[in-house]
Amino acid sequence: MRVNVTLACTECGDRNYITTKNKRNNPERIEMKKYCPRLNKYTLHRETK
């Protein structure tokens, strides 16, 4: 079962990306290095509720 999740920047808190994940294969929160336009650099983005 795939669900939509929102990724938020850990440094500025902006919610920049929406992606999908499979809850059966990845039950924990996902983390990705993505581009943050506010900070103009690549930062760690975490899944938010």
Swiss-Prot record:
Molecular-function GO terms, alphabetical: structural constituent of ribosome
Gene Ontology BP terms: translation
Keyword match Ribosomal protein: yes
Keywords per UniProt: Ribonucleoprotein, Ribosomal protein
Bilayer-crossing regions: none
Pfam families reported for this sequence: Ribosomal_L33 (PF00471)
Any one of the GO CC terms: ribosome
Family from the record: Belongs to the bacterial ribosomal protein bL33 family.
NCBIfam families: PRK00504.1, PRK00595.1, rpmG_bact
Name used for this protein in its record: Large ribosomal subunit protein bL33A
Protein species of origin: Staphylococcus aureus (strain NCTC 8325 / PS 47)
